[in-house]
Amino acid sequence: NYFGGSVANSNPLVTSSGTAALGADYTGWNNKYNLRLCGYQFNNYGTLLYADSSIKFQLSKALSFNLAAQSGTNNQLGNSSNALTNANLGQISSNFIGVQGVINYDWFSLNLGYNNVWGSSSAYGSGSIVTPYTYGFATDPLYTTPYMSGLADLGTAGTAYKISPTLTFINGNLSLAPAYTVFNTALAEWNGTQEYDFVASYN
């Protein structure tokens, strides 16, 4: 069991009996194409269906492009009540899409991401994604989730844009990755939020 307080803007003191998950992964075209399909049943916290796909174009030894897309839906799937509706926070009803483009050239790469999350204005967070196990960790798969908090962490529907270049040095052992993310959200308190990050790593 886990406590249901781990969603944004709320603290319903309700436990869940757990989560069931099922997924499939396909890779082809010499490992340059990938398709993933996943389903999660967060007991008492809704159902999440998710898919993403990516393809890589290797133009030369140093130059490559990656294109990716993702989509999903988050709802109650026949359950009339859950931890959020019982706490009068609205039903779970969300849809989301995202696209990502990455260019890699030798020691430099540039990552551009976009996400759109939407739902009923009467839903939790005006259509926010409910992900109890990733909230606060910035580990959800949205392309625009930055280091600190993304749309799921903010508990709101809306759009997000992210740009993140990466520079590598010393035969790829040193990596410097600044990032900028901006959010246009359905909830006024988060609208216009910007996050700047900088990650340095050495192997």
Give the residues covered by each predicted segment.
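A short acidic, glycine-rich active-site loop
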Residues: 7-12, 146-148
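Outer-membrane beta-barrel pore domains
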Residues: 39-203
